[in-house]
Each structure stands twice: as structure tokens, then as C-alpha cells.
């Protein structure tokens, strides 16, 4: 059992925030191209091409998760695994695993460690306010290899629904970390195990943990 897990998204909100200290005090699960900048133990890449880049880039100590659909193509890499099965069954389109994205699967991977709490960091959901087209895409890797096909902000309704399902089917606390003025979906606010925190609050928590370990 792991006490704390941090699931790192790639929303613009985390730009400038140092996530490195989290590695010593949490089990870190990263999404997609985060491996270009950080050496993590666990990376989730549901996109086939992103998974290929990950296996070409990451060392053997990084476990890479991808969709069951692509898994057989990476059978020669011992550090590639299938994402876990969903903890529930539903009849809607957004309940089908193929319509789940990397962020939600990264959170599901985090749940496998049975932690006391999971930090959801930089899952920004919404497009950048006042910006249109690719400028409105809320992702620090936008425009780079593997992201050029994203021409406009993605409708976050599936993401909101799917994360909400994970909150519902888990025993742990979820701490959603974002900017002070970020709007958390109402459906998430209704969950008793979901809490909102700022980056400043997370930084204070990190310092407290690091002080404890000295």
C-alpha cells in the first residue's frame, strides 16, 4: 500500500511549478509526453504513437501503460503493460474503455496502489479563456510531436464524467490541485471524498513532508 499517489496532467496551470520533489514522497504517475521532461516510475500513454515515443525514450525502470488495443504491438518491451480494467460497467458511450483518455487511465493506475490519497495535478479540463483554436488548447505540449492534430480545446464532458466515476468507485481521498481561481465541476464538488487545493497549498504540503523525512 502506498500512502500518497500524484497523478500529473499536462495542463498549462502547472507550468513553472516544480513537481520533482513529489517523486520522493508520492508514487508519481505521469501522462503522455511528460516523460520528455521528467523521469517517472509510471507513465500512461493511450495514444499508440505516444506509447512508441515513450518506449524509445524511457529507461527500463519506467513502467508504461497503454490501451489493450495497442498492447500486443509492444509485447517485446517488458516494461509495457495494459491499463487496468474499469472498476464498473455502464451502457453509455463514455463508459466504454476506448473512450477513456490518458488522464483518467492514469488516475485508475494510481488507484491500483490503494493509497490514502491521490493528488490530481494539472487536470485543467477547460480550454484557455479568451483564446481560440490551437491557442485555446490547454496543454503545455501543444503544437509538439504527437499533439499537432489537436486544433481546438477538447469538450471536457467525458473527462468530468469519467473522473467522477473513479471518485465514486474508490476508497481514497482525491485532492484536485489547480490555480486558486480554477472552477471545479459541480459534480465533483458533490463527492465527499474530493477536495480542492491550490499549487501554493500543495507546495506547503510538500515542504511539510520533506521536513518530516529529515
Residue ranges of model-derived segments:
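Metal-ion/cofactor- or nucleotide/acyl-coenzyme-handling active-site neighborhoods
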Residues: 1-214
